[in-house]
Amino acid sequence: MTLVTPLQFSTVQPNLYRGSYPREINLPFLRTLRLKYILSLTPEPLSTDPLMVKFCEENNIKTIHIKCQSERKADKTKPKIKRKKKTVPIEYDVVVRCVKFLIDKGHYPCYMHCTNGELIISLVVACMRKFSYWSTVSILNEFLVYNSSINIHERNFIENFNSEIEVDDLDIKDKVPWITVRYIARTATESKDELRVDDANASEKVARVSSVSNSLPKLKFHSM
């Protein structure tokens, strides 16, 4: 049997995959990934698709839906309605919700997708790369692998992502190793927050939050 990947399929990190909305021809391939979850960044959830519902039930795959607008081009045959045009198709809350879900190593293997595997997924992945200290050049180069160009609004969206994300009900030891090498935690002996940096090759480094670069996002764990 020939295995066909979804359009724009790629591995983001071990056991985390990205691509477009799965079609019937892609299901044998997705089955080989032994997925636990499918994360959909689409207008409608997979639960509205009988084919995908059956596939997920047969393979014990749970689905998560974060509603996003369609990436398809507007239908020029329809009458134009004057409204404020969004500069990018998602808000930062979509990225935050994705990070909160993907930080838990218990949610892997996971396939995340938008409608066509291009802009929305690329924006989310680009923002998440900042947790791994990717350079801006590397982030934008990866973005351009899946998109023919990047406009100023999309670039600003990526570069200005510096949210402090509250993480509840997850122990630090249960986070995936590739996301967040820098996190904020409240210590048991002090009332002030401290910034801690994970370093696999050295002892834990500690610095005050005031010294943190404002250009980087941070995670704040409450279960420590």
UniProtKB/Swiss-Prot annotation:
- Cross-referenced PROSITE patterns: TYR_PHOSPHATASE_DUAL
Active site, per annotation: C114
| Stretches assigned to the Tyrosine-protein phosphatase domain | 8-170
Query: Which EC main class describes this enzyme?
Result: hydrolase
| Cystine residue pairs | none
Q: Which GO terms describe its molecular function?
A: phosphatase activity; protein tyrosine phosphatase activity
What UniProt keywords apply to this chain's record, in alphabetical order?
Cytoplasm, Hydrolase, Phosphoprotein, Protein phosphatase
Q: Which residues carry this modification: Phosphothreonine?
A: T2
CDD domains hit by this protein: PFA-DSP_Oca6
* Localization, UniProt: Cytoplasm
Q: Name the Enzyme Commission number(s) assigned to this protein.
A: 3.1.3.48
Q: Carries keyword Protein transport?
A: no
What this protein catalyses is: O-phospho-L-tyrosyl-[protein] + H2O = L-tyrosyl-[protein] + phosphate
Q: What the protein does?
A: Required for replication of Brome mosaic virus (BMV).
Q: Which family does it belong to?
A: Belongs to the protein-tyrosine phosphatase family.
What's the name of the protein? Putative tyrosine-protein phosphatase OCA6
The gene for this chain is OCA6
